[in-house]
């Protein structure tokens, strides 16, 4: 068996906003660690830790790939929309109720009070509680009309925004062909 010492090609960018910067309120520090040999990005920050591996690609340098990806692509790779947004869920459910359910269920004359009752569902409710409350308020509502809106976690959105605004321009500058 042969043991070989490998000195990996890793590049790290550290970002620490100044106390007066707007970003300081959402993220006080973040490190973007690019493992160029394996095509992996690790993001460590006080807004959360995220990681994704693209794998090695002999046809494109990893830093070139990182210089050209867009934020929504990166966000989708490092996270998933799993945070329940009850405010947006209420709005979409009320829209669905007005568009599809009011005539079908014969509740057009009570629509204003029904929508008001949906708006008053506790803003700290879970998605399951929200769903059950809407079903209680509007018996017979089609389950597909009860919209459960999920978003990416705040921390993931923050580190991707910082990547696009500060790190990616630096990568382009440092690795311009």
Question: For each of these PLM feature ranges, what is it?
Answer:
Residues 103-177:
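A eukaryote-biased signal for long
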Residues 60-134:
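Long acidic/polar interaction regions in large eukaryotic complex-forming proteins
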Residues 34-79:
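Aromatic- and glycine-enriched beta-alpha-beta binding-site module
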């Amino acid at each position: 068996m042969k043991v070989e010492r490998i000195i990996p090609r890793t590049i790290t960018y550290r970002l620490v906003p100044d106390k007066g910067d707007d970003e300081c309120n959402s993220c006080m520090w973040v490190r973007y660690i690019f493992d160029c040999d394996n095509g992996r990005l690790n993001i460590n920050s006080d807004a959360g830790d995220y990681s994704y591996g693209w794998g090695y690609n002999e046809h494109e340098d990893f830093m070139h790939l990182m210089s050209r990806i867009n934020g929504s692509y990166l966000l989708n790779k490092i996270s998933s929309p799993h945070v329940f947004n009850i405010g947006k869920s209420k709005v979409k459910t009320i829209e669905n109720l007005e568009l599809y359910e009011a005539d079908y269920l014969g509740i057009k004359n009570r629509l204003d009070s029904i929508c008001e009752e949906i708006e008053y569902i506790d803003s700290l409710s879970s998605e399951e509680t929200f769903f059950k409350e809407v079903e209680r308020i509007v018996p017979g509502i089609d389950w597909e009309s009860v919209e459960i809106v999920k978003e990416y976690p705040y921390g993931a959105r923050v580190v991707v925004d910082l990547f696009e605004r500060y790190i990616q321009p630096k990568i382009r500058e440092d690795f311009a062909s």
